[in-house]
Amino acid sequence: MKRLLIVLGALLAPLPAHAQQVGANEAPTVLVTGANRGLGLAWAQKYAERGWNVIATARQPAQASELQELAARTGRLQIELLDATDPESVDELAKRLAGQPIDVLVNNVGMLGDEPEQRLGTLEPDRFDTYMRVNALSALLVSERLLPNLRAGQQKKIVGISARVASFAAYPRIHSGLYYYKASKVALNMVLRNLALDLEKDGIVVVTLSPGVVNTYGTPDNHDAMSPEMRASMTDIDSSVAGMIKVVDGLTMEGSGRWYRFDGQQIEW
């Protein structure tokens, strides 16, 4: 009898944290756009390591070697072709994902571009249009087309990645220049604010997140292009994304329509 009780106790003991992974069919699902590198790759990696089902999009999946390695290693990652600025590509993704609940949508696609082309005297209307499509329109298209998936999800959360330089309240501390980038991120902020208003009735939380100044493919290598404040506030990708995921975990309808830093601090518009 004593031996039987010991065996039963071992069977009923709680599993260690790393072993409490739910099955793929029971786990929540996150979709991350622009997940082939930088912040997007970090979002995908951290959610996969948490046991979530991850749908990671890239414009050229065959060349997304780090995503492929992550998929093979975790068994939790599905790579999908997507050009988030192309309505047809977004529609095709929505068709492929029809009936798939999505708990969290991370609109990560974005571009900072080259600082010299965004100065007075060098501006080109076509380039401005490109930045607007990448940094603002993409989030609107993807969020709209995937609304059925988000409504079917349990958590119902949409996030977009903006930047402190798009805050009017941050002036005059923000440096000049970067006309395309700043204007397009301001547009993204309004897209997300409008989505928050429209989707409140569906119980979908929509927020803007700022990763801080991180060393990614979107950050200029030339630190002279940054203000002293930006240089002093630089953080690493892992800390930034871990912080943003913590913010996402704690989101409720009360916080919908707001803008948060990766450390949870609210940013004024």
Q: Model features per residue range: what roles?
A:
Residues 33, 102-112, 135, 160-162, ...:
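Rossmann-fold scaffold of SDR-type NAD(P)-dependent oxidoreductases
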Residues 71-88:
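Rossmann-fold cofactor-recognition segment
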Residues 111-112, 118-132, 137, 151-201, ...:
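Catalytic loop of short-chain dehydrogenase/reductase
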Residues 201, 208, 220-269:
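C-terminal helical subdomain
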Residues 84-100:
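Conserved Rossmann-fold cofactor-binding substructure of NAD(P)-dependent oxidoreductases
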Residues 169-171, 210-223:
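Short beta-loop-alpha junction of Rossmann-like oxidoreductase domains
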Residues 50-65:
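Conserved glycine-rich Rossmann-like NAD(P)H-binding loop of the short-chain dehydrogenase/reductase
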Residues 36:
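Conserved glycine-rich cofactor-binding loop
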